[in-house]
From Swiss-Prot:
This is Replication-associated protein. GO terms for molecular function: ATP binding; ATP hydrolysis activity; DNA binding; endonuclease activity; metal ion binding; nucleotidyltransferase activity; RNA binding; RNA helicase activity. Its EC number is 2.7.7.-, 3.1.21.-, 3.6.1.-. It catalyses: ATP + H2O = ADP + phosphate + H(+). Interacts with the capsid protein; this interaction relocates Rep into the nucleus. It comes from Canary circovirus.
């Protein structure tokens, strides 16, 4: 059976370490008529290795075999991101040796890359950063696609951290300094702007979410939260709740079974007058994390 040939593409990027004068001359001699846009810059890696970093947007599709004839020692990959993104990347050390044409605006390969990112379950904010021009033009369609095909539902226990103490001791700051992307949940039903961040922060909480909703958020099973016009999967790994009051005061014990809330709390810290410490068992009206 004949070997499968790699698919051709118009947009390629390459890295060529320890380039020779002859190889540099080949890059400088590329013919303008073959490209929509091309750029190549000189760089030095973290270990001081000199290399050429290039991006070529051909007018006709090219296979890897043809590119290897051009620069045999180079590492070639199909390009991601927009032409503008690659222009910035290849010129970041301000030593450009080749520029042909102008970056192509919003090419279809960028759109295909953004769609693939949605299908892979990437956060919309990350897609917007990587494919900024595409997002400006097709953002609504990408969001609709994400809502239609859905994020992978949660299949793990969301960690719940509670931080209590008086005003001005640094509860909000402690929450904000935790590692990971963050979404600040405001009072109200809607989660507009939620993009599956690592951490959801509920600042100055005093029971303004329905008890049954809070239990579902703190659990391990699939759950959707409402955005205007639809629902999105809740997949955050951690919920951080700051409050001036203890959890037993958040909900009415006559109407809500508070042990169900407490057992979903993984960690509870309080201000002891000097620092934040784990709450001693004697202060817990119900056991946590069981």
């Amino acid at each position: 059976m004949a070997p499968v040939r790699a698919a051709a593409a118009k947009r390629w990027c390459f890295t060529l370490n320890n380039y020779t004068a002859e190889e540099e001359a080949k890059v400088r001699a590329l013919l303008p008529g073959e490209f929509h846009f091309a750029i190549c810059g000189k760089e030095r890696g973290e270990q001081g290795t000199p290399h050429l970093q290039g991006f070529l947007h051909f007018k006709k599709k090219q296979r890897l075999s043809a590119l290897k004839k051009l620069l045999a020692r180079a590492h070639w990959e199909k390009a991601r991101g927009s032409d503008h993104d690659n222009e910035e990347y290849c010129s970041k050390e301000n030593d450009v040796i080749l520029t042909i044409g102008e970056p192509v605006q919003g090419n279809r390969s960028d759109l295909a890359g953004a769609v693939a990112a949605v299908k892979a379950g990437r956060r919309m904010v990350d897609i917007a950063r990587e494919f900024s021009e595409i997002y400006v033009k097709y953002g609504r369609g990408l969001r609709d696609l994400a809502l239609m095909i859905g994020q992978k539902p949660r299949d793990f226990k969301t960690e719940v951290v509670v931080i209590t103490g008086p005003s001005g001791v640094g509860k909000s700051r402690l929450a904000s300094e935790m590692e990971g992307s963050k979404f600040y949940k405001m009072k109200g039903d809607w989660w507009d702007g939620y993009s599956n961040e690592d951490i959801v922060i509920m600042d100055d909480f005093y029971g303004w979410l329905p008890f049954c909703e809070m239990l579902r958020l703190m659990d391990r099973y699939p759950h959707k939260v409402p955005v205007k016009g639809s629902y999105v999967e809740f997949t955050s790994k951690k919920i951080v709740i700051t409050s001036n009051t203890h959890p037993e005061s958040w909900y009415c014990p006559d109407k809500c079974y508070l042990p169900a809330l407490f057992r979903r709390i993984n960690k509870w810290m309080y201000w002891d007058g000097l620092r934040f410490e784990d709450v001693p068992d004697a202060m817990k009206k119900h056991p946590i994390n069981y």
